[in-house]
């Protein structure tokens, strides 16, 4: 039996960490803007009889922080692996962003709509803004990959 050297992987974590850091800022800003400018007022208008609809308190912010962290990590990892596999063309980038958006936000909002917890107007506002958010996020990952 002979012992052979195992070659070290040439994968660099720095571009992925840069993309994750930038997306932590971008996605959090986008989520906060979309929520405060559109979703929260629309939810309160649509469901005035529900107490505590779209509340603003510490437990909500803590859950939102967990949501944003999972969202950023998922988007960055899925985008990185997909761009590595399918290429970094603009077409691939937009398609990957659209796929991640459909997997997260379309399912979320359709579920809320199906349970009568969202109106068509909320969907028609939140979904396009979320699509822009995720396509930009995937472009950030692409930029970081190509920069390496």
Can you describe what each PLM-predicted range is?
Residues 1-148:
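Juxtamembrane/disordered regions of integral membrane proteins
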């Amino acid at each position: 039996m002979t012992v052979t050297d195992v070659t070290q992987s040439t994968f660099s974590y720095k571009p992925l960490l840069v993309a994750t850091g930038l997306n932590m800022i971008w996605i959090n800003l986008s989520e906060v803007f979309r929520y405060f400018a559109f979703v929260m007022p629309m939810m309160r208008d649509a469901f005035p009889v529900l107490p505590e609809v779209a509340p603003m308190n510490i437990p909500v912010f803590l859950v939102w922080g967990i949501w944003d962290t999972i969202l950023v990590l998922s988007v960055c990892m899925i985008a990185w692996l997909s761009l590595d596999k399918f290429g970094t063309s603009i077409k691939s980038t937009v398609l990957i962003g659209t796929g991640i958006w459909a997997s997260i936000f379309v399912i979320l909002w359709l579920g809320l709509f199906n349970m009568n917890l969202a109106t068509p107007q909320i969907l028609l506002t939140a979904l396009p803004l979320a699509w822009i958010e995720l396509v930009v996020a995937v472009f950030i990952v692409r930029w970081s990959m190509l920069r390496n």
